[in-house]
Regions:
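Alpha/beta-hydrolase superfamily serine-hydrolase fold, recognizing
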Residues: 1-278
Length: 278
């Protein structure tokens, strides 16, 4: 018998359809939960894509809620991060049913998903992140529930969209250029969504502890951009746990491997440290 049960539930109802989350529920829960956000250059993949890491975290006792969300080219910034905030609110509202502590919820995401979890965590209750109605949101207490999280795990995050856009142009990555254009309506919108800009302009209302992971052979996320993210976070006195992983490519953890197993252990250790610090 599997140690993890998987079920899909609707977490939000929008004008364009329902949004699903896949729940990875451990048979032996440790009472804590995390919301997972997939990558895909803001234009591809779904809640099933990061199943390897979802199963690893759930096997260790965590409830994992892996989200579908609206993305490009049919939807533009900030739709995705608004949906992610709704996903956090849903888990918080249903914490008793899901058997998780609402005060220890975290966010984890990779690549563009790493960008989106940072964006959501820094501005959880901004007006633009209150626009996706969660299921049962007719109740005022539900609709006003906070999307704040206790910590963030950002795996190879595209933290500064305009910087990565120029990098993609300079390196001839036309598919990445097209993906940026598909989700962001302009360079101004990319700049608006820059995590570094938000940190340095004091727009961030919440700066939770963060684990940032940079693979050494990442051809999609330049290391200089990630180091600038670390610096910007530290400038706000944010707690940063930075991991550089030599020899590994972008998005390696979407596939089972020893490196993925090691990363899962490191992620769990970081999460446990944040929960223990309460």
């Amino acid at each position: 018998m599997s140690e993890v049960e998987q079920t899909d539930v609707v977490y939000a109802c929008t004008d364009t359809g329902d949004l699903l989350m896949r729940l990875f529920r451990p048979l032996k829960s440790n009472g804590h939960g995390i919301v997972m956000v997939h990558g895909g250059a803001w234009t591809a993949n779904d809640r099933t894509t990061p199943w390897v890491m979802c199963e690893a975290l759930a096997t260790a006792g965590m409830l994992v809620a892996s989200l579908d969300f609206r993305c490009g080219p049919n939807f533009q910034h900030p739709t995705a991060s608004a949906d992610i905030a709704a996903g956090v609110r849903y888990v918080r509202v249903h914490a008793d049913e899901l058997q998780v502590d609402p005060n220890t919820l975290g966010l984890i995401g990779s690549s563009s998903g790493g960008h989106l979890v940072l964006l959501t965590a820094l501005k959880p209750d901004a007006l633009e992140h209150m626009t996706t109605p969660i299921l049962d949101s007719d109740d005022e207490g539900v609709s006003l529930c906070s999307a704040k999280v206790h910590y963030v795990v950002a795996l190879w995050p595209v933290s500064d969209p305009p910087v990565r856009y120029r990098y993609a142009q300079d390196t001839g990555r036309s598919e990445l250029v097209a993906a940026h254009d598909g989700y962001f309506s302009s360079l101004d919108q990319m700049q608006n969504a820059s995590v570094q800009r938000i940190l340095r302009s004091d727009e961030a209302t919440h700066v939770p502890p963060v684990m940032i992971v940079q693979p050494g052979e990442d051809a999609n996320v330049p290391e200089a951009m990630t180091l600038d993210l670390v610096a910007a976070y530290q400038e706000r006195d944010g707690l940063v746990h930075y991991r550089y992983l030599p020899g590994l490519p972008h998005a390696f953890a979407y596939q089972p491997s020893k490196a993925t197993d090691t990363l899962a252990i490191d992620v769990l250790a970081f999460i446990q440290q944040q929960i223990a610090g309460l």
